[in-house]
Design a protein with these regions (language model features):
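Pyridoxal 5′-phosphate
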Residues: 1-153
């Protein structure tokens, strides 16, 4: 936030309020409330269990593919499955998956610099599941990565 001091000038506040926006996005606030109500109706534990099951299915399937290296660590893992494929950059995997109508994202070492440096991580693929995904969608990703991996040889 700032004080408007003239037609072509303003003075920024010296405190943290300088980072506040004046306007509020009421539609987003209402949407957040509706989304929270919906999640509570579905059940947070049910959502958690579903995400865990789908992510475990994906990790198991990807882990069985020659050349795939799963990059997830930790005792409790989330619905974001990170992996790489030997000899193919993550951006190439993402591009190849687009032909299968599968969307993933790519995370470069700079997005998690300390962890990437410590673990020697390359650019990695991030495949995310949510409770509304189906087993068939997870299997389609696994099958597509299997085909992409087979073309490496």
């Amino acid at each position: 936030a700032a004080t408007w001091t003239g037609p072509d000038s303003y003075k920024l506040r010296p405190d943290a309020k300088r980072f506040e926006n004046w306007e509020n996005n009421y539609a987003a606030r209402l949407g957040l409330g509706v989304a929270a109500d919906y999640a509570l109706r579905v059940g947070l534990q049910e959502i958690w269990d579903r995400i865990q099951a789908l992510a475990a299915r994906m990790r198991k399937g990807l882990g069985a593919i020659d050349g795939v290296v799963l990059r997830d660590i930790g005792a409790t893992q989330c619905g974001i499955v990170t992996f790489s494929l030997e000899d193919i950059p993550a951006s190439g995997i993402k591009e190849s998956l687009m032909a299968y109508d599968i969307n993933v994202s790519v995370s470069g070492p700079s997005s998690t610099l300390l962890d990437a440096m410590r673990r020697g991580l390359p650019e990695i693929v991030r495949a995310s599941v949510h409770y509304y995904n189906s087993e068939a969608e997870v299997d389609a990703l696994i099958d597509a990565i299997s085909e992409i991996s087979a073309k490496r040889n």
